[in-house]
Amino acid sequence: MAFFFYFFFLLTLSSPSSSASSSNSLTYIVHVDHEAKPSIFPTHFHWYTSSLASLTSSPPSIIHTYDTVFHGFSARLTSQDASQLLDHPHVISVIPEQVRHLHTTRSPEFLGLRSTDKAGLLEESDFGSDLVIGVIDTGVWPERPSFDDRGLGPVPIKWKGQCIASQDFPESACNRKLVGARFFCGGYEATNGKMNETTEFRSPRDSDGHGTHTASISAGRYVFPASTLGYAHGVAAGMAPKARLAAYKVCWNSGCYDSDILAAFDTAVADGVDVISLSVGGVVVPYYLDAIAIGAFGAIDRGIFVSASAGNGGPGALTVTNVAPWMTTVGAGTIDRDFPANVKLGNGKMISGVSVYGGPGLDPGRMYPLVYGGSLLGGDGYSSSLCLEGSLDPNLVKGKIVLCDRGINSRATKGEIVRKNGGLGMIIANGVFDGEGLVADCHVLPATSVGASGGDEIRRYISESSKSRSSKHPTATIVFKGTRLGIRPAPVVASFSARGPNPETPEILKPDVIAPGLNILAAWPDRIGPSGVTSDNRRTEFNILSGTSMACPHVSGLAALLKAAHPDWSPAAIRSALITTAYTVDNSGEPMMDESTGNTSSVMDYGSGHVHPTKAMDPGLVYDITSYDYINFLCNSNYTRTNIVTITRRQADCDGARRAGHVGNLNYPSFSVVFQQYGESKMSTHFIRTVTNVGDSDSVYEIKIRPPRGTTVTVEPEKLSFRRVGQKLSFVVRVKTTEVKLSPGATNVETGHIVWSDGKRNVTSPLVVTLQQPL
């Protein structure tokens, strides 16, 4: 049979595949037992291709092969093909592809990273020198000064990566700063057909801007002067200014395809990166169906830290993505910088707004006619309220400021539509869901964004002015005030930042932390204007963007600094240091606020809090986790042996793991339990944790407890005495609830924390208790 497969394989090499273009086929990622390859096949590629040749349909071609973080291949298959492959004795799993999407300066200073400090994280880590951060994104614009290699030493000897040259990306585009650049489009082209190279680059070059922006946040060099359209003037710098960068382009016009993302993980690990930064996400699925979770496990198994964006689905609950416990999941917070652009109404009222519009402004001494898109005649109301394409009547918009509701199309696109229809300016109003969270945009006309309450105020003014015969027609102007520093309160949890609880494993608190993600200045390509709309002919070396996409590379860069300062720390130890030293108060000394509501935020919004780089360098204790600990976690999550092999490439003894504990006993730096309560009763559980001393020898840590409301919490022992650095000690946390009666379907979440303190360091872990009364 093997000889027949090999002969058939030779035939298929010269036969074009039709299944890739079949409307009934999808891309699948196939996990194979690579040890089972028959000796007759010279490579795994030959073996995989011969297996495909045995399928009933026209034999498909392989898109990617994987041999580092995952063993197998991806191919375009019909559901019948996929089912047939799953019956193959050496096929472990067949995973349908998911299409992911992007989660789209002053932040180093806000984080306390100053190049002038003589004894800080930057100095201790030599600014991240010789560590390589792999950025899986939309590529890179290598000519930007953020990627200049002046002053850097030779490329690290360990580096095995390449700079893939093309017509628009010469090999010389890489240097001692940008040490590698690759692109992966097989999955994209398998679904969409051959790329249109007039609209995007078939190379590592960035045609979107997102990848250039995130790469420079993580490791851009110091650049002065830096600004965009006159805003945020100052020094631009990444978190790890001397770290090296490798760009892995996986995102294209229609999205980021799992088969390409997994290929990027596979290649990045083989190339020798130290940190992987991923500002991409999709729908939460079980980990064994999640290509990002699978790729990330393969990376951390090799000692590579993986930072991933939490998503921009906030402020609603259960919106967090990239939730596997071996990834560090990053939400977004604000910094102490703002770009006020306020609306002055004809009745004298001022409405706060933000904008980074940099063109000719409105006449400050003049008031302009004001209209609401949703009340214009001739439209359907809904479309015109959102200022969608084709919804506005130029005769009713020309020469006026137009109020548009946020949603459906991008904020910058709304401005382009208003401008095309003759509008002089635009105000974007948040809806109830977005609340008061504001994002500054580089608009193509004078424009600003206001919160939900401000939008209501403006609509009310327009309505009352239009109805009153005695009053004048509604008017307004926009007053641009430039850049404002020292904003209080800050940080605040950004409105868009995705929230917990963790929809896949509520016992693992996600997001882990938040980092700067609102109105972040970073490098930008020449391909596209700062607004992102195609008609924007302005060009700038830097741009201001917002999203957890921007927060993630902050943590990626910080991880590189910590890895450089502590080369022996594992990815879990680095995450533990970030989590247990995070803070939850703002620069006014008050609990961090939720931007969307103006109320106090919670652990479901920020995880353990906002990262504190200086304290993370010296956390005292860390909660370390091995690959086998994660396997036990998966066993206790009731994953099958096949599921676990798909993720970890290892066989699992789940009988032993399940006897040893429960899913909450993963040695994570936070604690979360979900009680399913039936009637009025007391509930209890316990957590077992082990901490490693990375502080001082002969140190003693004592416990401090703030129990969640309605619970009793004890810790045994109450004191941990360490004789040496590297010593490990264990403790048990016991949680008991009081009798609480909930109505059917109700959920009650209470939070507290435990702190191990040696008098100098506070090792803080949040403790979350969730009570659910089933229907």
From Swiss-Prot:
Keywords noted in UniProt: Autocatalytic cleavage, Glycoprotein, Hydrolase, Protease, Secreted, Serine protease, Signal, Zymogen
CDD domains: PA_subtilisin_like, Peptidases_S8_3
Active site per database record: 137, 210, 549
A GO molecular function held by the record: serine-type endopeptidase activity
Gene Ontology biological-process entries: proteolysis
Highest taxon listed in the record's lineage: Eukaryota
Cell location: Secreted
Top EC class for this record: hydrolase
Prosequence residues removed at maturation: 20-103
UniProt main location, coarse: secreted
Domain Peptidase S8 span(s) in chain numbering: 107-617
Glycosylation sites: 196, 599, 638, 762
Record's keyword annotation contains Signal: yes
Residues annotated as domain PA: 367-459
Entry GO CC: extracellular region
Domain Inhibitor I9: 27-103
Signal peptide: 1-19
Alphabetized SUPFAM superfamilies for the sequence: Protease propeptides/inhibitors, Subtilisin-like
EC number, as in UniProt: 3.4.21.-
InterPro entries: PA_domain (IPR003137), Peptidase_S8/S53_dom (IPR000209), Peptidase_S8/S53_dom_sf (IPR036852), Peptidase_S8_Ser-AS (IPR023828), Peptidase_S8_subtilisin-rel (IPR015500), Peptidases_S8_3 (IPR034197), S8pro/Inhibitor_I9 (IPR010259), S8pro/Inhibitor_I9_sf (IPR037045)
Family of this protein: Belongs to the peptidase S8 family.
Protein name: Subtilisin-like protease SBT1.5
Source organism: Arabidopsis thaliana (Mouse-ear cress)
